[in-house]
Amino acid sequence: VGYITQIIGPVLDVAPSPGKMPNIYNSLIVKGRNPAGQDINVTCEVQQLLGNNEVRAVXMSATDGLMRGMGAVDTGAPLSVPVGEITPGRISNVLGEPVDNLGPVESSTTFPIHRSAPAFTQLDTKLSIFETGIKVVDLLAPYRRGGKIGLFGGAGVGKTVLIMELINNIAKAHGGVSVSGGVGERTREGNDLYMETKESKVINEQNLSESKVALVYGQMNEPPGARMRVGSTAPTMAEYFRDVNKQDVLLFIDNIFRFVQAGSEVSALSGRMPSAVGYQPTLGTEMGCLQERITSTKEGSITSIQAVYVPADDLTDPAPATTFAHLDATTVLSRGLAAKGIYPAVDPLDSTSTMLQPWIVGEEHYETAQGVKQTLQRYKEPQDIIAIPGLDELSEEDRLTVARARKIERFLSQPFLVAEVFTGSPGKYVSLLETIKGFQMILPGELDNLPEQAFYLVGNIDEATAKAATLQVEGQ
């Protein structure tokens, strides 16, 4: 037990009772009444031991109404959150408290949010592909099981729909669950994701136990302590499913940049000397501690997809640059493709993956992917000629390449289960083998006689040939 000696915005200095010095990361609870007579209950986390018998703590909720001299109680342990089967379908805050007005989250199991990464001996050393059922991803920028994927793309290019499809597919194909951490993003986006997950039955309101995703939010309006620590709460919930239930888990972090930004605010308020571009001197350590917890063990895996905001489009900024060091793959969403109506609008040439190597994915997959990329690259080069004088100015060979590339571009689109509401066509999960087979038929020209519309928004190649037959009948 101690009392508050100083308050600087979301940061408090507390003088503990003699001989009762709390450890770093312990949570303190400040209770009292504000001048208006309302009860105050603020949880803080110890960040620094200052000497002269004081500690500096960062609050996890607003510090309005706190006063010097108020009592603070040391809980003797780090922040702990409820984990387990009770979390899917619910929205929690950084402390694991529900914020969806559906009653309390009562779990017999709680985990502290500060946990060490799995030991090297527990890691799964085998490189394996994490099949998503999305053609463009599995073929050209495959995800690694237990890997980290950066998701790049502006507003309105289909990021939320892609995330929901992945949540849906991991539940159906891998029997896994997902955890989505909203780190310092707009409250509207968190609300949109919640509403859309309910609409597409990823969250089942009638029977929450059938839900496939747990949501943890620390949005833009929260103090920096909450925005920084929600980046630890979400992985903690995911670790339960990996370590105890031995499942494959998908962890979404939206947005990893805001995690760094919140850490920078806390660092400045704690009085640390800033480093490059005003970021915290501990940037690499904070990022590493979070990212190292996201991995495959021999029991299960956490595969993480992180939306990366690039400030002022500067890839050399310390925040995105530190993030890139940890990524295994990047999925870049393109506004140009979205404008053409090709969804998912994943850019096939800009998206990359360290897994696309012949000794990992196999010779057949690698050759097919390279063929697709080469054809699309050759289609990209004469765009100016196509746009102004028209296709007639191209050589016969180039015209054939363009025709095949346009078929490939359309075949990379796919109807999503969660987007059935918008597209009206049933969603499709396409296995990697079917994807490779389809492109192996388009590349050498086996399907040159089919119209390009036949390849748009279909699942596997058999559906494209069936669609072509239907189009021919309608044409007659």
From Swiss-Prot:
Q: How does it sit in the membrane?
A: Peripheral membrane protein
Which amino acids does the record list as binding ATP? 153-160
Family assignment? Belongs to the ATPase alpha/beta chains family.
The organism encoding this protein is: Dicksonia antarctica (Australian tree fern)
Give an example GO cellular component term for this record.
Answer: proton-transporting ATP synthase complex
Q: Which EC numbers characterise this protein's activity in its record?
A: 7.1.2.2
The name this protein carries in UniProt is ATP synthase subunit beta, chloroplastic
Annotated gene: atpB
Q: Which proteins does it associate with, and in what oligomeric form? A: F-type ATPases have 2 components, CF(1) - the catalytic core - and CF(0) - the membrane proton channel. CF(1) has five subunits: alpha(3), beta(3), gamma(1), delta(1), epsilon(1). CF(0) has four main subunits: a(1), b(1), b'(1) and c(9-12).
